[in-house]
Regions:
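Accessory alpha/beta interaction modules
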Residues: 1-166, 235
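Short, charged alpha-helical interaction segments and adjacent helix-coil junctions
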Residues: 2-5, 62-75, 101, 151, ...
């Protein structure tokens, strides 16, 4: 695993662990789309196949038979995300379709895809911006398009998206608090412990952190080299 991949992976892991539950995903989908989403209609479909190696999907889920939703959590700007989403969605649809059904004379209904990047990095990235698969094509004329919507979940007090959904706010604040403490000179271990204790005491991710205290510490500390962490967060 490269250093860049390792230093970003802790957030992806924590994001997946914290949000990959039907109640949170239903609320997050409703927040992003404005479409009422019932928890009981959410069916988690996250790709975990070794076939994709590092290209494992962060979170994907069906909403009844209407939508198939793919979330990727990113802390670096990645213009290749539409191509990755294309691979992920193809794999998900392949799992839904039998070999016999795709040769049937009857039209097979498919859930409509929705693609989101939840961006939590330090570099500026405009909220609600779009990434297009066609941007990578060598020719302007094409018959295939895929659009990824980027939502900026980087913590700041004025981020309206975070104000609308507490779990998203809490997650973003927790990551921000660890970063701030490391940038101020704390060791990575001390920063994680202090941020965790602070959040528990201030009802930020409280229930999750109480139950998963040591797991969160390991996810965030074992994937970082201390020197790399300080260099990155002090930029």
């Amino acid at each position: 695993m490269s250093k860049d991949h390792a230093k970003n992976n802790y957030r992806d892991s924590l994001f997946r662990k914290y949000f990959e539950h039907p109640d949170k995903l239903a609320a997050l989908h409703e927040l992003l789309t404005g479409i009422p989403t019932a928890e009981q209609n959410v069916e988690i479909k996250t790709l975990k196949s070794v076939l994709f190696n590092r290209l494992k999907n962060d979170i994907s889920f069906k909403v009844g038979d209407r939508f198939i939703v793919l979330f990727e959590h990113q802390s670096t700007i990645n213009p290749n995300m539409p191509a990755r989403m294309l691979l992920y969605s193809a794999m998900l649809y392949r799992k839904m379709l039998s070999k016999e059904s795709i040769y049937s004379k009857k039209l097979i209904p498919l859930p409509a895809p929705e693609f989101y990047v939840l961006y939590n990095g330090k570099d500026p990235w405009k909220d609600n911006s779009k990434l297009y698969l066609s941007s990578a094509f060598a020719e302007n004329q094409h018959n295939l398009e895929l659009v990824v919507t980027v939502r900026n979940i980087r913590y700041n007090k004025d981020n309206e998206l975070l104000q609308k959904y507490k779990p998203l706010h809490d997650y973003s604040f927790f990551v921000y608090d660890v970063e701030k403490r490391v940038a101020s000179g704390d060791s990575l271990a001390d920063a994680i412990r202090s941020a965790t204790d602070y959040c528990i005491n201030h009802n930020i991710m409280r229930d999750y952190l109480l139950v998963n205290y040591e797991e969160v510490f390991e996810m965030m500390s074992l994937r970082w080299n201390e020197k790399d962490a300080k260099k990155y967060w002090q930029k």
